[in-house]
């Protein structure tokens, strides 16, 4: 988001560092914290579809406010150390696709191919017409990250295949558009029309835009005092005070990567608008937006890394599409458009074994698909477990909910809820059916050090799956 950076966190974090008390050296030490994420395929391959982990809403040195407000040098060259941090973070967190969404200042001023920031052995990906639509970076461990180009201003076009049409000034005007004409221009450029910061967008605007998808969660919204107060109905300063505790570098400090536990909460206005549009019969996938700029907390935390490092933010959560080839940007975009995706707050744990499907006779329906009403189907939710959970740690509590948004009334009903290992629900009435999982992350309590385990005793949103539809 361009309105303001998160730099106002710095003072709070510095104060916490100065005031933090020393820890108890006798406290039990938990197993080492994993600063990375596993290959997405460890979540489980189902019916020939592999999960591909993606970041949707990500800023590079081609956003004017990235990299502590210094994304380019005096000669216009990108901030190479900041770019290197981004590239290393994508490798450490095993991101399969990085949907860059830079602000029009300065993204609109550059040739499209320049925006991929290809370095070293990166390879271009072209379409049938020879246009570069993506690039691939191979990490030291052989993992491949696919980059695509988009923008984030009032709207958020993603996975463009070329710049929108017109002169440089016309590009700026279109990227800053917020009407149906802008949406049409994004699609004409081969992209998807997404909406970031759903919490602040009027429902009338969303109806008129008819976007391809929206954010159901945005990190910046959960932290910014103004957004919390004006749009989320949350205490404006609560997130800052709580998150500042994780800047402690004294013995007994909490694991810095768990700072998100201090402010993670549902973006309820975004969820309500999603339900409203689903109740009107729209098909609408959702993502969670990292909104990462590496421009907010330059002070080092106890792990020696700045508080808002790309690696830390990308470690917190991502979006998973189900595809036959995780390296194919066309397949990824098709899955995004179709709604074959779900979001995961991976700071709470990587879910292994999750499967959401509907079955009717020999036919299986995936997320985003339409089930004929006359046919009916059985929705099955196989609840996941937390990957690699050390037996010495407390056991988390995982709960799934099946939510029906009826069309055309818009009535929202919880059809089933439980801790598993499986839920089965018949889908017969028209509407959208979505699955949401929450977790009480008790296994993280020992990593909270002198803060104590209270933050790990709260029920937190873990997974939002895009709906299936009965029509």
Residue ranges and their predicted role:
Residues 242-243:
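Acidic/polar low-complexity surface segments
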Residues 19-21:
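C-terminal motif of bacterial Sec signal peptides marking the signal peptidase cleavage site
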Residues 25-51, 63, 102-108, 275-471:
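C-terminal functional module detector
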Residues 214, 250-253, 334:
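Catalytic pocket-lining loop regions of alpha/beta-barrel enzymes
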Residues 1-12:
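Bacterial N-terminal signal peptides that target proteins for export
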Residues 246-260, 284-290, 294-295:
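Active-site clefts of carbohydrate-active enzymes
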Residues 30-238, 255, 265-269, 273, ...:
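A metal-dependent hydrolase metal-coordination microenvironment
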């Amino acid at each position: 988001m361009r309105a303001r950076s998160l730099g106002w966190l710095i003072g709070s974090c510095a104060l916490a560092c100065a005031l933090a008390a020393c820890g108890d050296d006798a406290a039990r030490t938990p197993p080492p914290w994993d600063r990375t994420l596993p290959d997405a395929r460890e979540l489980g391959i189902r019916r020939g579809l592999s999960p591909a982990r993606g970041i949707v809403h990500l800023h590079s040195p081609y956003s004017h406010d990235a990299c502590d407000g210094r994304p380019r040098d005096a000669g216009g060259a990108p901030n190479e150390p900041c770019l290197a941090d981004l590239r290393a973070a994508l490798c450490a967190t095993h991101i399969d696709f990085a949907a860059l969404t830079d602000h029009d200042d300065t993204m609109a001023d550059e040739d499209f191919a320049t925006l991929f920031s290809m370095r070293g052995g990166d390879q271009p990906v072209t379409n049938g017409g020879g246009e570069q639509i993506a690039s691939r970076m191979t990490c030291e461990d052989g993992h491949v990250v696919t980059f695509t180009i988009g923008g984030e201003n009032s709207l958020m076009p993603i996975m463009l295949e070329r710049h929108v049409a017109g002169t440089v000034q016309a590009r700026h005007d279109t990227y800053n558009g917020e009407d149906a004409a802008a949406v049409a221009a994004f699609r004409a450029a081969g992209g998807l029309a997404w909406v970031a910061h759903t919490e602040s967008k009027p429902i009338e605007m969303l109806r008129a835009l008819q976007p391809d998808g929206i954010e159901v969660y945005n990190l910046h919204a959960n932290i910014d005092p103004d957004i919390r107060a004006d749009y989320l109905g949350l205490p404006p300063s609560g997130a800052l005070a709580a998150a500042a505790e994780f800047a402690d570098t004294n013995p007994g400090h909490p694991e810095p990567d768990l700072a998100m536990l201090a402010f993670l909460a549902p973006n309820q206005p975004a969820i309500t608008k999603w339900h409203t549009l689903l109740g009107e019969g729209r098909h609408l996938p959702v993502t969670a937006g990292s909104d990462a700029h590496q421009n907010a907390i330059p002070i080092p935390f106890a792990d020696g890394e700045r508080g808002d490092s790309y690696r830390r933010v990308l470690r917190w959560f991502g979006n998973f599409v189900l595809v036959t080839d995780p390296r194919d940007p066309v397949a990824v975009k098709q899955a995004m458009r179709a709604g074959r995706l779900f979001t995961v707050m991976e700071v709470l744990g990587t879910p292994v074994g999750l499967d959401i499907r509907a079955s009717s006779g020999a036919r299986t329906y995936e997320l985003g698909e339409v089930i004929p009403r006359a046919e009916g189907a059985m929705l099955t939710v196989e609840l996941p477990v937390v990957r690699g959970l050390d037996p010495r740690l407390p056991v988390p509590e995982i709960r799934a909910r099946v939510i029906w948004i009826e069309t055309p009334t818009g009535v929202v009903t919880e059809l089933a809820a439980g801790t598993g290992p499986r839920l089965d629900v018949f889908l017969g009435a028209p509407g959208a059916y979505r699955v949401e999982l929450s977790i009480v992350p008790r296994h993280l309590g020992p990593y909270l050090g002198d803060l104590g385990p209270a933050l790990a005793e709260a029920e937190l949103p873990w997974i939002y799956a895009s709906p299936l539809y009965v029509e």
